[in-house]
UniProtKB/Swiss-Prot annotation:
It holds the Pfam family RecX_HTH3. This is Regulatory protein RecX. Belongs to the RecX family. GO terms for biological process: regulation of DNA repair. It is found in: Cytoplasm. The keyword Ribosomal protein does not apply. The gene is recX. It comes from the Bacteria. One of its GO terms (cellular component) is cytoplasm. Modulates RecA activity. The lineage of its organism: Bacteria, Pseudomonadati, Pseudomonadota, Gammaproteobacteria, Enterobacterales. It comes from Salmonella schwarzengrund (strain CVM19633). Its main location: cytoplasm. The keyword Cytoplasm applies.
Amino acid sequence: MSEPTSRRPAYARLLDRAVRILAVRDHSEQELRRKLSAPVMGKNGPEEIDATADDYERVIAWCHEHHYLDDERFVMRFIASRSRKGYGPARIRQELNQKGISRESTEKAMRECEIDWSEMAREQAIRKYGEPLPSNFSEKVKVQRFLLYRGYLMDDIQQIWRNFAD
């Protein structure tokens, strides 16, 4: 029978927790560190894991070694996921920045992904406002504001109306 959680070494408990977290979905290294340092809900309420900074570093290193934690893979999957939900490149970049991903990694992944952002912006506008897209000024402004909020760049948004005659 396994020993009670409270008697297991902090490193083993941290490693177990990291694997469970990463089994659900990919995380950035910063996200994993934040989740590992957060209190765990136990039978008697929140419990802290008395782990040293070295324990955290060993767990992160183990996750990298065993390919549980890979920021490149995380970035590519995150971009694909958020673009499927209709978000544009500016918003995706900002969210990756909040998750602790470097600007260089983000830009590299954005160049490698084969997403036509202007076509995505057009699809989002049609989904929200219907086809044909509005042509009067005040309605165009509403569409632009919506797409800017979703994270599309002004060039991609303006491309919708440039190709409007097609």
